[in-house]
UniProtKB/Swiss-Prot annotation:
Listed Basic and acidic residues bias regions: 339-352
Keyword Protein transport in annotation: no
Start-end of RING-type zinc fingers: 158-196, 426-464
TPR repeats mapped onto the chain: 67-100, 243-276, 278-310
Keyword tags: Metal-binding, Repeat, TPR repeat, Zinc, Zinc-finger
InterPro entries listed in its UniProt record: Lon_prtase_N, Lon_prtase_N_sf, PUA-like_sf, TPR-like_helical_dom_sf, TPR_rpt, Znf_C3HC4_RING-type, Znf_RING, Znf_RING/FYVE/PHD
Keyword Zinc: yes
Gene label: LONRF3
UniProt-annotated stretches for the region Disordered: 1-69, 322-413
Annotated source species: Macaca fascicularis
UniProt protein name: LON peptidase N-terminal domain and RING finger protein 3
Length: 718
């Protein structure tokens, strides 16, 4: 149908077939060009322009019936995707001064829609006498030579503006963005562009910020630059790092209506990073604002070739700082709308978020006329609007890394001569970062190193900023960029570092050698043992027991001579409740008895090599005698417990639970009947008097001992 309509237009008389297309929506123009092959049937080649008579010379922009027919033909060719043929007709019309910028609307719209389908146009030769065009062409010529020296790993690019990271700020969710990109999106409903978590929940206030809140002020949480990453980027990529700063400075000047000054910043930035597509796309916008259309189109072509498959969305954005995000996604609309830019350039500050949302709604493709073409509607079906990211809605597509450059171009490059593994060493353990975590103050440590420091003091080990909120939340997310950087460029060092960590975890998970010992009180098998953990060494011990997966440690009585008793009980952690100041309450229960073979220490807490002990089983007449003794002592213990006062009995029940039932076979459990240990825990005995019962390997001796204790207590009560 489209082909038939085009052929009919080409066959109409000049008076009827004038260019009467409806005006396209503002901003629906392009920063990219598509010269790829198309499947449509080829239309007839544009007819050559007749030679003009000298007396027929007209003023620029004057339309004749002949020029209207050719303009209609050029627009039709552009709509069909035959861009080269259309440009040839436009060029001839321009040479005859029968073409004005407003008549290129159809071409620009088609360029914006057709770019992702194929290759970009070859660079156009600079016009004679055009100094600016010559400068652009010279930059393109030198770009290939400088690209190898400035090619940047895709991981070093901001996932919000898709440019080289400038003043990188790592959020507590683990993702890193440019500081200015985050400052532009710090409203209460803003979210991380990758994981969708609210920024207000990520930006943890430091001690100074909390102090100002107590004074009645409400300052925004400070954004601190990632010290390690910022220093590394400046060392490895001084050119792109400086170019990124110049880009942000140019954006600021552009918003302040200092367009010429912004152009100078971008010219300098392009020299430092000639393969950064954002620089060309943004400079194309500046050229178009200055009505230097040839330079604008030329820069747009270069941006297209640097990132041919990265152009997706088609949304009009209100200012240059946001246009670079659109250019990173391939938004050509914001790059070629001088009227829009001039209108927004009159403002001296960034617009409020609600105003931007209203503007986006008014200028979105859905609000525009349906006559702007089927390409717009088709594109809206296959892309997500960028406003989701800036208005607080997580964009699923943004979670994926942006596509790397196509072709034979290397996906990453790093100046290994200047790269040193010591640049990625933890300041606490002096080893390569393993599971790096960045604090709100901008310092990076290994996760385990940071946790150990917070066990002692809730402050940053380097700058002493308060980290109590981090300690309270206990949600540490690994820094994504730094993990990927180490895995990509230091694989051998990371392998060795991981090996050390795994060996340490394997050693810690051994429940026979170097078992962690909590020196505190008596513990018994099957009996609950709640613990209040506040000492730094035991915080570390409990955390390691959980991390290794064993969730077990030994409990022993203290000994003034040996350090701790020779016998103890293994406790298993059932639950841990953490407090904001780092303390915790551990719900544990006794599992097995052990004897200490060798004592030692590790990182401030006691450890021991142990052997597990069990009751010796009996058979025959001894077994029958044991059964009778077991039934008798159980009845005696039950009578004593029920004779206690109600208040005391309730306290025992709340702490230890109800008395266990009598076992049908007292030798079924290697540690003996559960009710025996429950009774020993509630009997009013000193810990030293209870310890021999834990060491006994004869159930008969243990039952006789309990019977004697009950008899002694009953006599004293009477």
């Amino acid at each position: 149908m489209e082909s038939l309509r085009t052929e009919q237009m080409l066959s109409l008389p000049a008076e009827v077939s004038s260019n009467n297309l409806e005006p396209a929506e503002r901003g629906a123009s392009a920063a990219q060009v598509d010269m790829g092959p198309h499947r449509e049937a080829a239309a007839e080649s544009p007819a050559p322009l007749p030679t003009r008579e000298p007396e027929q010379e007209q003023s620029p922009g004057t339309s004749t019936p002949e020029s209207k027919v050719l303009l209609t033909q050029a627009d039709a060719l552009a709509s069909r995707g035959r861009i080269r043929e259309a440009l040839e007709v436009y060029r001839q019309l321009s040479e005859r001064q029968q073409l004005v910028a407003e008549q290129l609307e159809q071409l620009v719209r088609c360029l914006a829609e057709k770019v992702p389908q194929g290759e970009a146009l070859a660079p156009a030769p600079p016009g004679e006498g055009s100094t600016a065009s010559g400068a652009v062409a010279a930059e393109e010529t030198g770009a290939a030579a400088a690209a190898a020296a400035t090619e940047v790993w895709d991981g070093f690019k901001c996932r919000k503006c898709h440019g080289f990271l400038s003043d990188p700020v790592s959020l507590s969710c683990g993702h890193t963005f440019c500081k200015l990109c985050l400052e532009r999106g710090r409203a209460a409903d803003r979210r991380c562009a990758l994981c969708g978590v609210k920024l207000s929940a990520l930006m943890v206030a430091t001690g100074r910020a909390r102090g100002s809140r107590r004074a009645g002020q409400q300052p925004p949480p400070p954004l601190r630059v990632n010290v390690v990453l910022s220093g590394l980027l400046g060392k490895l990529f001084p050119g792109p790092a400086r170019a990124s700063q110049l880009r942000h400075e140019g954006n600021r000047l552009y918003r302040e209506r200092q367009v010429e000054a912004a152009l100078l910043k971008y010219n300098e930035a392009v020299k430092l990073a000639p393969n950064d597509h954002l620089l060309y796309s943004n400079r194309s916008q500046i050229y178009f604002t200055l009505e230097s259309h040839e330079n604008a189109l030329h820069d747009a072509e270069i941006a297209c070739k640097l990132r041919p498959m990265g152009f997706k969305d088609n949304l009009e954005l209100p200012h240059c700082s946001s246009q670079e995000e659109a250019a990173a996604r391939g938004d050509g609309s914001s790059l070629m709308d001088p009227a829009k830019v001039k209108g927004d350039g009159q403002q001296h500050h960034m617009k409020d978020q609600e105003e931007e949302e209203e503007k986006w709604d008014a200028t979105s493709p859905k609000a525009a006329s349906s006559k702007t073409g089927k390409c717009q509607e088709k594109k809206r079906k296959h892309c997500q609007i960028e406003s989701q990211e800036d208005t607080g809605m997580p964009n699923k597509a943004s979670k994926q890394d942006p596509p790397t450059d196509q072709g034979d171009k290397p996906a990453l490059s790093l100046p290994l001569a200047s790269f040193d593994a010591s640049d990625l060493e933890c300041a606490l353990c002096m080893r390569l970062f393993y599971e790096p975590v960045t604090t709100p103050c901008g310092h990076t440590f290994c996760l385990k190193c940071l946790e150990r420091c917070l066990d002692h003091n809730a402050k940053c080990p380097l700058c002493k900023d308060g980290l109590s909120q981090c300690l309270a939340s206990r949600k540490y997310s690994k820094n994504v960029i730094m993990e990927e950087l180490i895995a990509k460029f230091l694989p051998e060092e990371l392998k060795e570092r991981r090996k050390l960590y795994e060996e340490e975890m394997e050693e810690l998970s051994n429940l026979n050698k170097n078992v962690p010992i909590f020196v505190c009180t008596m513990a018994y098998p099957t009996v609950p043992c709640p613990l209040h953990i506040f000492e730094p060494c035991y915080r570390l011990m409990i955390r390691r027991c959980i991390e290794t997966g064993t969730r077990q440690f030994g409990m022993c009585l203290g000994d003034p001579v040996k350090g701790f008793a020779e016998y103890g009980c293994i406790l298993e952690i059932r639950n841990v409740q953490f407090f904001a100041d780092g303390r915790s309450v551990v719900d544990s229960i006794g599992k097995r008895r052990f004897r200490v073979l060798h004592q030692s220490q590790r990182d401030g807490y006691n450890t021991a090599d142990i052997e597990y002990i069990e009751d010796q089983k009996v058979q025959g007449e001894d077994c029958a005698e044991l059964m009778g003794l077991h039934n008798c002592v159980y009845q005696q213990a039950s009578l004593w417990f029920h004779s206690l006062k109600s208040s005391l009995k309730n306290r025992i029940l709340n702490h230890f639970g109800p008395m266990p039932e009598k076992d049908a076979d007292p030798q079924m459990n290697p540690n003996g009947p559960a009710w025996c240990w429950w009774m020993l825990a509630v009997l009013p005995l000193e810990s030293r008097a209870q310890l021999p019962f834990l060491a006994m390997r004869s159930l008969k001796d243990r039952l006789n001992g309990i019977r004697r204790v009950l008899a002694f207590i009953s006599r004293n009560q009477n």
